[in-house]
Amino acid sequence: MREETREQPAPLRSGLTTGSCATATSLAAARLLLSGETSDAVSITLPKGKVVQMRLEFCRLAGESAEAGTLKDAGDDPDVTHGALLYSQVRLLDEPSIRFVAGSGVGTVTRPGLVLAVGEPAINPVPRRMISEHLQRLADECGYFGGFEVTVNVQGGEQLALKTMNPRLGILGGLSILGTSGIVRPFSCAAYIASIHQGIDVAHTNGYTHIAACTGNASEDTMRRVYGLPEIALIEMGDFVGAVLKHLRKVPVPRLTLCGGFGKISKLAAGHMDLHSRHSSIDLPQLAGWAADIGADAALQAAIIGANTSQQALALAHAAGIALGDAVCAHALAFARSVVPAQVQVEVFAIDRQGGIVGRAGVQ
């Protein structure tokens, strides 16, 4: 077996989530209001008990409110928010409650199906809890019995959000404030997988009975062309087909179409749930075996085994009149069906680099 791309893992630096940034800036602003204390750094406690210190860009009074900001540091993770200025504005309330507001660059939920209700600011539950716990501790220390209004902002967040799944999920106007551990693990993929689950949830809750999970832009374009599916029904799964298949056990959407490049679909056919080259490889001898099952002679089998890429193997089979693309999709279909509930109808498409369909199996 050989990999089609080479990637060498290296030690990477962790960062802090937007939820941690919002907690730190909210705490600093509230402390300034209650005690008059300001500083250029603030310490917060993460959900698992680790204490981290975060540098502040500013902490100042703004009329009856206070505001504090920090630069988001995602470590070595390719996070669109890395380096963005996140700042919180805090206002004191008479009633003992904490009210969250979506400020500039933070989105608002507009579709049902997410963990937050329609109309709520896109500040997820764990960041809300982190902020609330820190502000309550501060209130106890200061003998304060009122509440807080917390407005979270991300400079340039509305444009940054266009690079995320938020528009497709119905989170409009900016980014989501995220995080479950408070720490960004480089390339941990947790946020990506969460967005896949959210995409399925939103499509299902809004009544869509057919979704297409796609590995990239070309496969999404193919699904638009073949089925005319709207954005809400297109799930950008990347390499994480396992995240789609397993989630359908919880949310059994009636019909699932899987669409991806031939090489990635061949990995799914071999039973891989993660299609990235770090975790799964193209098995050319297996491709040759599947070609043999549908009539490939010994010479073609040898040529497939010796191919440089799966695309070359496919081209060799196609030139010999062997429908390897369909065979691979049939094996991928069988594996996918073994994971999802029986009531979910599944089909699989394989495409070439130009988006042309080179294989298909399942519902027609």
From Swiss-Prot:
Entry GO MF terms: cobalt-precorrin-5B C1-methyltransferase activity
Catalytic activity: Co-precorrin-5B + S-adenosyl-L-methionine = Co-precorrin-6A + S-adenosyl-L-homocysteine
Annotated signal sequence range: none
EC number: 2.1.1.195
Annotated coiled-coil segments of the chain: none
GO BP terms, alphabetized: anaerobic cobalamin biosynthetic process; methylation
Domain of life: Bacteria
UniProt keyword Acyltransferase present: no
A Pfam family: CbiD
UniProt record similarity statement: Belongs to the CbiD family.
HAMAP family xrefs: CbiD
Designated name of the protein: Cobalt-precorrin-5B C(1)-methyltransferase
